[in-house]
């Protein structure tokens, strides 16, 4: 079994975004700085610590270069 030399965290793209709308199952519609909207889901640490995310909040998201229409919310700014 060979492992890929590229680390998963190095291939992720981190961007600040704004939450526009709440969707079901802890998913959110977020707006990127280029005014494009994508679907984002909550990371496990945010879910475990019961951090509430509301429309209008600024968040940090991780985008995968392989699936750029879906993101993961990793941090909510105060």
Curated annotation (Swiss-Prot):
| Keywords of the record | Cytoplasm, Initiation factor, Protein biosynthesis, RNA-binding, rRNA-binding
Q: Which residues form the S1-like domain?
A: 2-78
Does Cytoplasm appear among the keywords? yes
Entry's Gene Ontology molecular function annotations: ribosome binding; rRNA binding; translation initiation factor activity
Q: Does the keyword Cytoplasm apply?
A: yes
Give the chief site where it resides: cytoplasm
Where is this chain's protein located in or outside the cell? Cytoplasm
Note the coiled coil stretches, chain numbering: none
InterPro entries, from UniProt?
Answer: NA-bd_OB-fold (IPR012340), RNA-binding_domain_S1_IF1 (IPR006196), TIF_IF1 (IPR004368)
Signal peptide span: none
Q: Which residues cross the membrane?
A: none
GO CC terms on record?
cytosol
Q: Which family does it belong to?
A: Belongs to the IF-1 family.
Q: How does this protein assemble? A: Component of the 30S ribosomal translation pre-initiation complex which assembles on the 30S ribosome in the order IF-2 and IF-3, IF-1 and N-formylmethionyl-tRNA(fMet); mRNA recruitment can occur at any time during PIC assembly.
Entries under PANTHER family matching the protein: TRANSLATION INITIATION FACTOR IF-1, CHLOROPLASTIC
| UniProt function note | One of the essential components for the initiation of protein synthesis. Stabilizes the binding of IF-2 and IF-3 on the 30S subunit to which N-formylmethionyl-tRNA(fMet) subsequently binds. Helps modulate mRNA selection, yielding the 30S pre-initiation complex (PIC). Upon addition of the 50S ribosomal subunit IF-1, IF-2 and IF-3 are released leaving the mature 70S translation initiation complex.
Q: What is this protein called?
A: Translation initiation factor IF-1
| Primary gene name | infA
């Amino acid at each position: 079994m060979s492992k890929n030399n590229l680390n998963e965290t190095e291939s992720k793209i981190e961007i600040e975004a704004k939450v526009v709308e709440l969707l079901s199952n802890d998913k959110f519609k977020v707006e990127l700085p280029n005014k494009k909207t994508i679907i984002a889901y909550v990371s496990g640490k945010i879910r475990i610590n019961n951090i509430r995310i509301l429309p209008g909040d600024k968040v940090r998201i991780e985008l995968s270069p392989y699936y750029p229409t879906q993101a993961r919310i990793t941090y909510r700014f105060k």
